[in-house]
């Protein structure tokens, strides 16, 4: 049987734009879940969320007018407790029935059924299914209560409020209307936030053809709002329309220009308008002398405009505005937006011109007045630490010129923090440093490194372009990690105010993707001297932290937990080689010999752990059993070949060479007693196993591949 569809709308004052989409999805999602839980909507029911600046709504398909009655079986008590020897109800049973709204007349109808080892009494009854009005009342209250509201407003209801007992309400914004339609039927008994449901809503604040818009049925809601109310109610439809208009406007301008791609800005603008209208505006070309990042940021962040870029990605003097009105003559709207943006761009030009009057080097001294952390000193002290770490890293790489340029870039990397432009737009730190370094005539490698030393800023971000940038970026992140761990300022749960997890992943990415010939623990220790006595040595805990981040990253890349565990158990120092080690482990695990060798390796590990400190020396004269002689001979024959492949970086070949050891290893454990009574035999056999263990576990701890 087909049931009518349901439409519910809350009409409110302008909702916070950055939360709108989440609010709309949550409102619709909870509403559907609650209706399904009460049996009013089925698993086949579908919900469509509507969210605009002044409304949250949901359209649910196939909603029953009343839920089906439910058979309920209530366990009462054991028969021996509820009935006496004559079969009459005991006072305990009568009391229980009374609590459930029944009396002694229900006793003959009680059902007996096994309950564990005893027999119990059950009261079978039928519970009437909730009507849609009853169920929607509960669902609506739950939907409102569970909205992810960023900040709650408390407001007084009007004196004409129809809901008795309601005087004030807490909600994200004041609500002024409630629509609840089941097909064409208005669910008049439903209420929320002091509002009683009806079928009238409001369209666009200025351009609605009629007001109020009387919704005829649940299925005509979106169409009527569009035709009579001049509102595109669905967030996704409105977003798509804005994107279409942006592209069309860019094509109208011509010359291959395109609007800047920014999903967050598009989402925010979608949440600001109900009837989008994209207009082309422009500003004076003289402002293009200012770095385009400054102009783009001020237009996006302050005005919600879409700058137009040419085919090479350069900013043009035109931009697109998403208006909420469609006047016959748009010139006033265009002119108003052009007037508004001009002072913003003039401010950016003023900051840029003023900042260039001083060199970056002359600003470094001012960093001594900027506090970085009360336990780690000023930004000036931090700069000196980053310089020292950068020099140490460059020396490990062995490039004198790299060390000189890295030192210069590290000295100037934070200088733009005390410029007017970065003071106004903190997001431009590093970027403005590059521009000012170029204006000061510094080498391109140094200028690029100043911008790139913050990279990667987020997951998926690019890495520094050149070697100088990589060295300074590594030094900057190591300074933060070592410093914060050294004072015990560690991330906890969701709290990571200094982005230490991101910094650790940045270090990992640079070491791996740039294939740097640097050892992790050497890097960590090289950062310590720069701090003097300000911190405790955190290298052990910091190394654990970095390996944990590496493990998580590798699992996200598709490696199994066993593979990752096997490689990282060895605490590899050259992270750039971890990928080759994992590939070798995966190839080894696919061999038919792998399970037996992994299990044997686990057994060897346990034996050696119990034996304590075991020397890998083997005396051939003490080999008595044929199986141990065969294993020794196999090690002598194949381990040198495997070692040579390992030294050449062929980890896969190294492990595959050792696969031939399966047969002699199996025979050894079948025929040889390792813990012989004679001490010299026992030590010799343990030494043989130690030799096997060393040979097998150079690439990874293969015992971690054994099935538990």
Swiss-Prot record:
Its main location: cytoplasm. One of its GO terms (biological process) is arginyl-tRNA aminoacylation. Pfam families: DALR_1, tRNA_synt_2f. Tetramer of two alpha and two beta subunits. InterPro entries: DALR_anticod-bd (IPR008909), Gly-tRNA-synth_bsu (IPR015944), Gly-tRNA-synth_heterodimer (IPR006194). Belongs to the class-II aminoacyl-tRNA synthetase family. Its EC number is 6.1.1.14. GO terms for cellular component: cytosol. The gene is glyS. This is Glycine--tRNA ligase beta subunit. PANTHER family: GLYCINE--TRNA LIGASE, CHLOROPLASTIC_MITOCHONDRIAL 2, GLYCYL-TRNA SYNTHETASE. It catalyses: tRNA(Gly) + glycine + ATP = glycyl-tRNA(Gly) + AMP + diphosphate. One of its GO terms (molecular function) is glycine-tRNA ligase activity. Keywords: Aminoacyl-tRNA synthetase, ATP-binding, Cytoplasm, Ligase, Nucleotide-binding, Protein biosynthesis. It is found in: Cytoplasm. It comes from Paracidovorax citrulli (strain AAC00-1).
């Amino acid at each position: 049987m087909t049931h009518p569809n349901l439409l519910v709308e809350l009409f409110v004052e302008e909702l916070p734009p950055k939360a709108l989409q989440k609010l709309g999805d949550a409102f619709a999602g909870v509403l559907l879940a609650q209706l399904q839980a009460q049996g009013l909507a089925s698993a086949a029911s579908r919900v469509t969320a509507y969210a605009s600046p002044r409304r949250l709504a949901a359209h649910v398909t196939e909603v029953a007018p009343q839920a089906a009655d439910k058979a309920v079986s209530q366990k009462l008590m054991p028969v021996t407790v509820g009935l006496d020897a004559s079969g009459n109800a005991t006072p305990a049973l009568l009391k229980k029935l009374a609590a459930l709204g029944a009396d002694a007349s229900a006793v003959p109808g009680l059902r007996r059924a096994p309950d564990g080892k005893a027999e119990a009494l059950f009261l079978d009854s039928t519970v009437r299914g909730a009507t849609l009005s009853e169920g929607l009342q509960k669902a609506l209250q739950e939907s409102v209560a569970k909205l992810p509201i960023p900040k709650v407003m408390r407001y007084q209801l009007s004196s004409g409020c129809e809901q008795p007992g309601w005087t004030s309400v807490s909600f994200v914004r004041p609500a002024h209307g409630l629509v609840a339609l089941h097909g064409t039927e208005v669910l008049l008994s439903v209420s929320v936030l002091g509002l009683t449901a009806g079928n009238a809503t409001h369209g666009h604040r200025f351009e609605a053809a009629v007001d109020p818009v009387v919704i005829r049925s649940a299925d005509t809601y979106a169409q009527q709002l569009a035709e009579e109310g001049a509102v595109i109610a669905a967030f996704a439809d409105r977003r798509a329309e804005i994107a279409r208009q942006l592209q069309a406007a860019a094509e109208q301008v011509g010359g291959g220009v395109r609007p800047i791609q920014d999903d967050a800005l598009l989402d925010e603008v979608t949440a600001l308008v109900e009837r989008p209208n994209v207009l082309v505006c422009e500003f004076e070309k003289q402002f293009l002398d200012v770095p385009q990042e400054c102009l783009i940021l001020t237009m996006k962040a302050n005005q919600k405009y879409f700058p137009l870029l040419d085919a090479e990605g350069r900013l043009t003097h035109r931009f697109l505005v998403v208006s909420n009105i469609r006047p016959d003559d748009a010139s006033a709207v265009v002119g108003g937006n052009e007037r508004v943006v001009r002072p913003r761009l003039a401010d950016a030009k003023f900051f840029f011109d003023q900042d260039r009057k001083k060199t970056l080097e002359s600003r470094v001294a001012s960093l001594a007045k900027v506090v970085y952390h009360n336990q780690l000193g000023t930004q000036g002290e931090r700069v000196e630490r980053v310089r020292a770490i950068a020099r140490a890293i460059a020396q490990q790489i062995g490039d004198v010129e790299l060390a000189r340029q890295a030192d210069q870039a590290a000295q100037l990397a934070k200088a733009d923090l005390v410029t007017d432009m970065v003071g106004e737009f903190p997001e431009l730190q590093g970027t403005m440093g590059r521009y000012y370094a170029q204006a000061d005539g510094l080498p391109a490698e140094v200028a690029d490194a100043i911008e790139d030393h913050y990279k990667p800023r987020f997951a998926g971000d690019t890495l520094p372009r050149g070697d100088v940038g990589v060295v300074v970026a590594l030094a900057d992140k190591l300074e933060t990690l070592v410093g914060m761990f050294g004072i015990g300022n560690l991330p906890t749960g969701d709290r990571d105010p200094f982005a230490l997890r991101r910094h650790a992943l940045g270090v990992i990415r640079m070491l791996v993707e740039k294939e740097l010939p640097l050892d992790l623990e050497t890097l960590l220790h090289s950062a310590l001297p720069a701090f003097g006595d300000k911190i405790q040595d955190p290298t052990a805990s910091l190394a654990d932290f970095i390996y944990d981040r590496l493990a998580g990253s590798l699992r996200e890349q598709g490696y199994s937990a066993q593979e990752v565990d096997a490689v990282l158990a060895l605490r590899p120092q050259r992270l750039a080689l971890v990928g080759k080690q994992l590939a070798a482990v995966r190839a080894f695990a696919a061999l038919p010999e792998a399970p037996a060798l992994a299990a044997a390796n686990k057994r060897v590990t346990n034996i050696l752990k119990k034996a304590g400190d075991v020397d890998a020396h083997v005396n051939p004269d003490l080999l008595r059993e044929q199986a141990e002689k065969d294993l020794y001979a196999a090690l002598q024959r194949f381990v040198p070949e495997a070692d040579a492949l390992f030294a050449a970086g062929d980890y896969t070949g190294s492990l595959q060479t050792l696969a031939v050891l399966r047969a002699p290893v199996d025979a050894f454990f079948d025929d040889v007693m390792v813990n012989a009574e004679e001490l010299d035999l026992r030590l010799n056999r343990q030494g043989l196993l130690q030799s096997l263990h060393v040979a097998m576990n150079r690439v990874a701890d293969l015992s971690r591949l054994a099935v538990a």
